[in-house]
Amino acid sequence: MTPSPLRLLLDTAALQHNWRTLAAMSGRAACGAAVKADGYGLGAREVATRLAEAGCRDFFVSNWREAEHLAPLGLQLSVLHGVRDEDMPAALAGFARPVLNTPEQVERWRVGGGRACDVMVDTGMNRLGLSVTDVEAGALDGLEIETLMSHLACAEEPVEMNRRQRDALAGLAGRTNARRMSLANSAGIALGPDYHFDLTRPGLALYGGVPRPDMGARLRQVVRPQAQVLQRRRVPAGDSLGYNATWRAPRDTEVAILNIGYADGYLRAFSDRGSIEWEGSTLPVIGRVSMDLIAVDASIAPGLREGDWVAIAFDLPGQSAASGLSQYELLTGLGARYDRLWS
Ligand SMILES: *Cc1c(COP(=O)(O)O)cnc(C)c1O
């Protein structure tokens, strides 16, 4: 197959380092991995295989399609969105556990004869999960539960809501048959031992995202997009460049045109905001990001030529600040056109 003119360099050692770091930060608790949304855009199978090799045992996906994709790996999978009627055949096949979220799902699982499951309890986020009141009233009595979990709404912020959510989950200890309890996502791990329970569930930080500045020094960048120069040109002073002529050359300007655009997840938010690296120089994106192309000011890189590969700046906290996109959006938006190359 023809090599793609776009590639993601994916760093196995950095991914495994990040998991080991989060596992160490999780103390006595086991450390799992959220690999939903195709492993946050990196490729769920490749990510899960490497994390399993590092010692990870608990993997979380969103739905049964995603679980089926990973089933051949033989890992312990949990499906965060629970079970619909149409999921029951897959759910009863036993290659993953549903995370039951509603009284209807609990009933469906009981009637269908399902065995071990996980359960999500809502402790204040008001997204998915049974209410604490329902659990206290016995909604889960008799159910074979592996993990009773909840999810933090604001783990990356120092707000009092974290403590309230933590206390609400802790209050259910012993109220069900659950073998384990779980609360913390990536940022929640940094909230300390009170938040670790028996199992943590990081996603973002595994992939090099930094949910809290104090975690930045300990995590390594995993994803490095690269694109190629399609054309180099000189834009005369006063000429415009790109769609809607939003950029105008203040002087004669050397420009390189690269084959990456918003169809590759490099969204228009990077117009006049993104940058690339080439042989130690940082070249700014100028003008509007197109579907398949961007332009950079190459004035300080006289040696940059048609066909050269360049690195798209993709340190997640920095590029999130530059673009206004979340680190999660930067990862999960990475499109299908990249060759994903694991080192
Ligand atoms: C996505 C998700 C996680 C992982 O969250 P990060 O912020 O990416 O670490 C953990 N638990 C649940 C329920 C999730 O949906």
Residue map of PLM features:
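Active-site-proximal beta-alpha core segment in soluble small-molecule metabolic enzymes
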Residues: 2, 6-17, 29-171, 175-182, ...
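Active-site anion/phosphate-binding pocket segments in diverse small-molecule metabolic enzymes
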Residues: 2-19, 66, 83-85, 101-108, ...
